[in-house]
């Protein structure tokens, strides 16, 4: 029975691709999960996989703080090493982030091969520093391969949950009507700024007959400020596959996970990169989609609602005015999104894991 450790923690961008890979593994595989206390994995993982947590963080501080973080990393690496030996782990799969550092270092210590997946166009710090210690660095976007020194990068795409890969119904609570559907994905980071610019641009669109689903995130005090029968606001939805598959257009941040979900659904997008994202990786992610004609980039700045309103008019206006399909700019954007998609990303990663175990590295 092959034994795999998955190290994935924190945000959905790290967690959901790892869950997609775990679901795609043969039933004969044994999976242990490594995470961090009090993060999203403690809610999603234990019902399916055995979860072990260790405290892990970055090394961004200085002086005493950095020393404490380094000692914490060493302690976490020691704990992971014991786990690897106790469980008889044969291969490690990680999606980067803080938890990847002790997992990669412990695996290196034990001589266990690692597959590291980097979903962003600009690799994270852990990937840049420790990718050289991994047997394979898989990347979601081909431009990332050039930015990973000392490692063999393989382009696999970024896995998405299986529901995104099969037809899903439109949720019943979506506003009824014949107007085009706009889905706004506020996200958990920086949702307030994005939501504010969206609300500044929506009134004319709603009056023209556009239906809007606005997923605001949990920390938006302005919910209810706009009241219109064509508008539904709620913090989040468990029916994202159905929403995106039926949406004519989405407004979203440019996290790699969100971008992959948009791509497999073929959903054109206005991307608003999170301004405080590390290394401006969301800007680089968005540029990859824009280069294929799949997305329009709007930046969050002083005149944000005017810029967003202009983009919405350019993209949704022809459909709202009933123009011929040939003049609809969303059609080539949909084709561009499909070019960005790698629908078999989970299977490609499973194949890499099988090859490592089969080679007995």
Swiss-Prot record:
Its EC number is 2.4.1.227. GO terms for cellular component: plasma membrane. The keyword Ribonucleoprotein does not apply. It is found in: Cell inner membrane. Keywords: Cell cycle, Cell division, Cell inner membrane, Cell membrane, Cell shape, Cell wall biogenesis/degradation, Glycosyltransferase, Membrane, Peptidoglycan synthesis, Transferase. GO terms for biological process: carbohydrate metabolic process; cell division; cell wall organization; lipid glycosylation; peptidoglycan biosynthetic process; regulation of cell shape. Transmembrane segments: none annotated. It is a peripheral membrane protein. One of its GO terms (molecular function) is undecaprenyldiphospho-muramoylpentapeptide beta-N-acetylglucosaminyltransferase activity. Pathway: Cell wall biogenesis; peptidoglycan biosynthesis. Pfam families: Glyco_tran_28_C, Glyco_transf_28. Cell wall formation. Catalyzes the transfer of a GlcNAc subunit on undecaprenyl-pyrophosphoryl-MurNAc-pentapeptide (lipid intermediate I) to form undecaprenyl-pyrophosphoryl-MurNAc-(pentapeptide)GlcNAc (lipid intermediate II). Belongs to the glycosyltransferase 28 family. MurG subfamily. HAMAP family: MurG. This is UDP-N-acetylglucosamine--N-acetylmuramyl-(pentapeptide) pyrophosphoryl-undecaprenol N-acetylglucosamine transferase. It comes from Prochlorococcus marinus (strain MIT 9313).
């Amino acid at each position: 029975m092959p034994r795999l450790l998955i190290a994935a923690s924190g945000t959905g961008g790290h967690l959901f691709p790892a869950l997609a890979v775990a679901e795609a593994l043969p039933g004969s595989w044994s999976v242990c999960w490594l995470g961090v206390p009090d993060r999203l994995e403690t809610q999603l993982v234990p019902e399916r996989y055995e979860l072990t947590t260790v405290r892990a963080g970055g090394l961004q501080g200085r002086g005493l703080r950095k020393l404490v973080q380094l000692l914490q990393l060493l302690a976490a690496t020691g704990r992971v090493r014991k786990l690897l030996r106790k469980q008889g782990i044969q291969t490690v799969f990680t999606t980067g982030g803080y938890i990847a550092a002790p997992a990669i270092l412990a695996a290196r210590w034990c001589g266990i091969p690692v597959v590291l997946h980097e979903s962003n166009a600009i690799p994270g710090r852990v990937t840049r520093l420790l990718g050289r210690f991994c047997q394979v660095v898989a990347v979601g976007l081909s431009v990332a391969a050039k930015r990973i020194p000392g490692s063999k990068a393989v382009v696999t795409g970024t896995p998405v949950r299986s529901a995104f890969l099969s037809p899903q119904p439109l949720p019943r609570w979506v506003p009824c009507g014949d107007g085009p559907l706009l889905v706004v994905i506020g996200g958990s980071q920086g949702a307030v700024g994005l939501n504010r610019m969206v609300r500044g641009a929506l009134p004319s669109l709603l009056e023209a007959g556009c239906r809007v689903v606005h997923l605001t995130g949990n920390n938006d005090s302005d919910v209810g400020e706009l009241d219109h029968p064509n508008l539904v606001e709620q913090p989040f939805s468990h029916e994202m596959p159905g929403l995106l598959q039926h949406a004519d257009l989405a407004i979203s941040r440019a996290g790699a996970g969100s971008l992959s979900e948009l791509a497999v659904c073929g959903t054109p997008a206005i991307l608003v990169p999170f301004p405080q994202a590390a290394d401006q990786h969301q800007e680089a992610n968005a540029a990859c989609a824009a280069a294929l004609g799949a997305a329009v980039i709007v930046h969050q700045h002083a005149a944000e609602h005017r810029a967003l309103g202009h983009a919405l008019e350019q993209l949704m206006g022809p459909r709202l005015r009933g123009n011929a399909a040939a003049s609809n700019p969303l059609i080539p954007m949909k084709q561009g999104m499909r070019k960005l998609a790698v629908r078999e990303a989970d299977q490609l990663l499973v194949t890499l894991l099988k090859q490592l175990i089969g080679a007995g590295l």
